[in-house]
């Protein structure tokens, strides 16, 4: 769980997302409140419910990007799901309780990594012994082992190939639900793995280099030192208290006025979401999980429908409303130049792999922003995503010929931008299909 203050969270989001200060503030406060709640007296802690958020704004203004960056910052179980992927209980498809089961799986992964880090030093010692066993055998004299140990630590044997035995992770195939027992998920071909574990675990032989073997061996030895029951218990607790669910495209399940057919199913998904958002208990293969304190952040463009088209009960469970504003020319300029992984920086780095030095003048950046704004206003407003389309069009020739132009420098100015997309941007009929 992150201990960042709201101001630190906002400044971290500012590195990747331009503008939308209100939305950043809302998620920063919500994230900080998770930490504040943990500091309370247990009797009061259960009474403090998360204030769920509804983000409203056109496509391409940063709703999904805020969720992606928040996931990395949170240090807590976090899952982003599309509301349109789920169907009403009784219909073919995934039911909404699967969201919580997937969230627990994320929690299991986080806790397991944390536990592995705690025992890494001890696991490294055991891994080194196993590498030595593979190199000199188990019957070698102590002097021989020490001689090889010194070479191993000096990196002299890094490229030598050895055979090691590591735990077999199974087929990795999906599973199926046991009828009448939601959450009781059985792997299709993992029954043999279950029996294998009961008889001491299955292993497989792998041929690899000494250096590469450490990753598998340290993971193997770490897993022997950690208790799976403790991991499951901690993951369920972490999911219940710190879990965050980001529900994207919530506007697509809003029933429109006079809607028939699909609208009924959409309303069914909303009704199924209600208990989840308010607080219920979901059965998972790791035990029951309470959703009372899981934070839900919903987002949608609401082009066709409006937030008031959602079920009144669901609206009431999303008390914090944040509106994200459309992007203007200055925002596009800043997106191209100021963000940590800006498009211009990405394209420069890509061209540097071909020994091509790519430079953009200030007026070129202005021209790119102008074209993006014009297309968004005349064709369809897709926000910052328009910049990727325009940039690809401008750099098409350079990307194609880059291998033949290694060692040269290319400067892109406003004239170059206009030459490659200017005419097309002015012709609205054409740009509908090409940009």
From Swiss-Prot:
<dbReference type="GO" id="GO:0009376">
    <property type="term" value="C:HslUV protease complex"/>
</dbReference>
<dbReference type="InterPro" id="IPR003959">
    <property type="entry name" value="ATPase_AAA_core"/>
</dbReference>
<feature type="binding site">
    <location>
        <position position="18"/>
    </location>
    <ligand>
        <name>ATP</name>
    </ligand>
</feature>
<feature type="binding site">
    <location>
        <position position="313"/>
    </location>
    <ligand>
        <name>ATP</name>
    </ligand>
</feature>
<keyword id="KW-0346">Stress response</keyword>
<feature type="binding site">
    <location>
        <position position="385"/>
    </location>
    <ligand>
        <name>ATP</name>
    </ligand>
</feature>
<comment type="function">
    <text>ATPase subunit of a proteasome-like degradation complex; this subunit has chaperone activity. The binding of ATP and its subsequent hydrolysis by HslU are essential for unfolding of protein substrates subsequently hydrolyzed by HslV. HslU recognizes the N-terminal part of its protein substrates and unfolds these before they are guided to HslV for hydrolysis.</text>
</comment>
<dbReference type="GO" id="GO:0016887">
    <property type="term" value="F:ATP hydrolysis activity"/>
</dbReference>
<dbReference type="InterPro" id="IPR019489">
    <property type="entry name" value="Clp_ATPase_C"/>
</dbReference>
<dbReference type="GO" id="GO:0051603">
    <property type="term" value="P:proteolysis involved in protein catabolic process"/>
</dbReference>
<comment type="similarity">
    <text>Belongs to the ClpX chaperone family. HslU subfamily.</text>
</comment>
<feature type="binding site">
    <location>
        <begin position="60"/>
        <end position="65"/>
    </location>
    <ligand>
        <name>ATP</name>
    </ligand>
</feature>
<dbReference type="GO" id="GO:0008233">
    <property type="term" value="F:peptidase activity"/>
</dbReference>
<comment type="subunit">
    <text>A double ring-shaped homohexamer of HslV is capped on each side by a ring-shaped HslU homohexamer. The assembly of the HslU/HslV complex is dependent on binding of ATP.</text>
</comment>
<feature type="binding site">
    <location>
        <position position="248"/>
    </location>
    <ligand>
        <name>ATP</name>
    </ligand>
</feature>
<dbReference type="GO" id="GO:0036402">
    <property type="term" value="F:proteasome-activating activity"/>
</dbReference>
<protein>
    <recommendedName>
        <fullName>ATP-dependent protease ATPase subunit HslU</fullName>
    </recommendedName>
</protein>
<dbReference type="InterPro" id="IPR027417">
    <property type="entry name" value="P-loop_NTPase"/>
</dbReference>
<dbReference type="InterPro" id="IPR004491">
    <property type="entry name" value="HslU"/>
</dbReference>
<keyword id="KW-0547">Nucleotide-binding</keyword>
<dbReference type="Pfam" id="PF00004">
    <property type="entry name" value="AAA"/>
</dbReference>
<keyword id="KW-0067">ATP-binding</keyword>
<dbReference type="GO" id="GO:0005524">
    <property type="term" value="F:ATP binding"/>
</dbReference>
<dbReference type="GO" id="GO:0043335">
    <property type="term" value="P:protein unfolding"/>
</dbReference>
<dbReference type="InterPro" id="IPR003593">
    <property type="entry name" value="AAA+_ATPase"/>
</dbReference>
<keyword id="KW-0963">Cytoplasm</keyword>
<dbReference type="InterPro" id="IPR050052">
    <property type="entry name" value="ATP-dep_Clp_protease_ClpX"/>
</dbReference>
<keyword id="KW-0143">Chaperone</keyword>
<dbReference type="Pfam" id="PF07724">
    <property type="entry name" value="AAA_2"/>
</dbReference>
